[in-house]
UniProtKB/Swiss-Prot annotation:
Gene, per the UniProt record: Chrm2
Protein name as catalogued: Muscarinic acetylcholine receptor M2
Disulfide bonds: 96-176, 413-416
Membrane-spanning segments: 23-45, 60-80, 98-119, 140-162, 185-209, 388-410, 419-442
CDD domains linked: 7tmA_mAChR_M2 (cd15297)
GO terms (BP aspect): G protein-coupled acetylcholine receptor signaling pathway; presynaptic modulation of chemical synaptic transmission; regulation of heart contraction; response to virus
Positions annotated as glycosylated: 2-3, 6
């Protein structure tokens, strides 16, 4: 807080600069905003907790952002309201420094979370083959923890111990502001680092995100889903290993049959050489396969996803070898960056050469992936995630820009900004914490429905709300 209400030397003889009805109005408005902020962000946190469809990596970042906004609603808003209506700081220097440290740490954590959300979406869109492999809950937790720890290191020590570093406390009794903000160069530098630089980075990232998303949606619209080849020319990477002469049981005497099992794919006895799919992430709603050779035991293989097993029967005299390929696909689970997998197993005879074998595998993969391609989620899901990020980014810029512009002006001309304008600008930064939950609800129907169920106490099946 760069300027404060002037106080006398004892700081206790000051009366409020506002009239009684103005004080009542300020308290009512500020109290209402605080209450809405608290309720809204609690709804966000509870919704993510109880609704499994909201438990995605992207929403874990929103959960962290909601935690920061909740702290602002509980502490920062109410203490600043007290400071404003009374006209001086009545709680002493220790509480003042603790409040300022908490205020700036959580505010900076909000900015850091916004940066994380922007980078996460950017990598999802621009690196769909590699980034989702690294995009785990553990990684998200580490990034969130880093945002909070970095924010604490940047602000808390400087705010709490600056008076001891310089050897004197220059903040007068009855006032509460960050002491090192009296230095114009420091004020200018912190404004650049805390607002202008993050805004520039997030704006550039969003521009790339929007461009990539529009390009993808445009491409999908040009290609009718019914006529699309669900498998790209580079789908099968690497050659299928040629069958060897290991003796093992054959099929069912030339018959062709399909087996679809949920969870387990039983194997016949004997040694099997299997080409197992290497999980390689693809872009949203697409399928990719990468084959690598591995030996597998003849026991049951349990998977999280459905296992589809296709066997081509041969005469019992043929030496055969089992070949399997894992198809890694992407499902839309809210953040458009979640991989799933399906395993295709083929048994071929030793009489087939490598090219024929690979052609059979490719045809089977086409057959497997054709049906999911018809059920491809509409481009609106892609737009939903991008729209949410845009709403959060715009809310952040609109609410934080006035105060940070005033900070730069104050560096060169302190008397140019009236006290009331400072107060409004500072409050706008707080209002960002009130707006964020509304952004989630307006841009995400699942959040909106879950909020409604919670507010109306409809808890039945709330965990499955889409």
């Amino acid at each position: 807080m760069n300027n404060s209400t002037n106080s006398s030397n004892n700081g206790l003889a000051i009366t409020s600069p506002y009239k009684t009805f103005e004080v009542v109005f300020i308290v009512l408005v500020a109290g209402s905003l605080s209450l809405v902020t608290i309720i809204g962000n609690i709804l966000v946190m509870v919704s993510i907790k109880v609704n499994r469809h909201l438990q995605t990596v992207n929403n874990y970042f929103l959960f962290s952002l909601a935690c920061a906004d909740l702290i602002i609603g509980v502490f920062s808003m109410n203490l600043y309201t007290l400071y404003t209506v009374i006209g001086y700081w009545p709680l002493g220097p220790v509480v003042c420094d603790l409040w300022l440290a908490l205020d700036y740490v959580v505010s900076n954590a909000s900015v850091m979370n916004l940066l994380i959300i922007s980078f996460d979406r950017y990598f999802c869109v621009t690196k769909p083959l590699t980034y989702p492999v690294k995009r785990t809950t553990k990684m998200a937790g580490m990034m969130i923890a880093a945002a909070w720890v970095l924010s604490f290191i940047l602000w808390a020590p400087a705010i709490l111990f600056w008076q001891f570093i310089v050897g004197v406390r220059t903040v007068e009794d009855g006032e509460c502001y960050i002491q090192f903000f009296s230095n114009a160069a420091v004020t200018f530098g912190t404004a650049i680092a805390a607002f202008y630089l993050p805004v520039i980075i997030m704006t550039v990232l969003y521009w790339h995100i929007s461009r990539a998303s529009k390009s993808r949606i445009k491409k999908e619209k040009k290609e009718p889903v019914a006529n699309q080849d669900p498998v790209s020319p580079s789908l099968v990477q690497g050659r299928i290993v040629k069958p060897n002469n290991n003796n093992m049981p054959g099929g069912d005497g030339g018959l062709e049959h399909n087996k679809i099992q949920n969870g387990k794919a039983p194997r016949d006895g004997g040694t099997e050489n299997c080409v197992q799919g290497e999980e390689k992430e693809s872009s949203n709603d697409s399928t990719s396969v990468s084959a690598v050779a591995s030996n597998m035991r003849d026991d049951e293989i349990t998977q999280d996803e459905n296992t589809v097993s296709t066997s081509l029967g041969h005469s019992k005299d043929d030496n055969s070898r089992q070949t399997c390929i894992k198809i890694v696909t992407k499902t839309q689970k809210g953040d458009a960056c979640t991989p799933t997998s399906t395993t295709v197993e083929l048994v071929g005879s030793s009489g087939q050469n490598g090219d024929e074998k690979q052609n059979i595998v490719a045809r089977k993969i086409v057959k497997m992936t054709k049906q999911p391609a018809k059920k491809k989620p509409p481009p609106s899901r892609e737009k939903k995630v991008t729209r949410t990020i845009l709403a959060i980014l715009l809310a952040f810029i609109i609410t934080w820009a006035p105060y940070n512009v005033m900070v730069l002006i104050n560096t060169f001309c302190a008397p140019c900004i009236p006290n009331t304008v400072w107060t409004i600008g500072y409050w706008l930064c707080y209002i960002n914490s009130t707006i964020n939950p509304a952004c989630y609800a307006l841009c995400n129907a699942t959040f909106k429905k879950t909020f409604k169920h919670l507010l109306m106490c409809h808890y039945k099946n709330i965990g499955a709300t889409r």
